[in-house]
């Protein structure tokens, strides 16, 4: 077994939240129990598409927002 990863602190929907260092946005969405295609995401005020979440490693101090996608026509 590997050693536990250190924790980083970030803001999740305006509240303090910690995750292991190296966690991706995709991993956090799943760990929080969300269905990935039912939630939209932004980090530091910038929208992050579902296809880009696995590549977006969270950093100490990031501000993450999870919200319902807006659909319609």
Please identify what each model-predicted range represents.
Residues 1-72:
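Ubiquitin-like/PB1-type beta-grasp interaction modules and other compact soluble beta-rich domains
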């Amino acid at each position: 077994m590997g050693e536990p990863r250190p924790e980083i602190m970030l803001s999740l929907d305006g509240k303090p939240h910690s995750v292991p260092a190296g966690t991706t946005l995709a991993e956090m969405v799943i760990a929080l129990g969300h269905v990935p295609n039912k939630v939209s995401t932004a980090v530091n005020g910038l929208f992050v598409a579902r296809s880009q979440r696995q590549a977006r490693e969270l950093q100490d101090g990031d501000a993450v927002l999870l919200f319902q996608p807006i659909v319609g026509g």
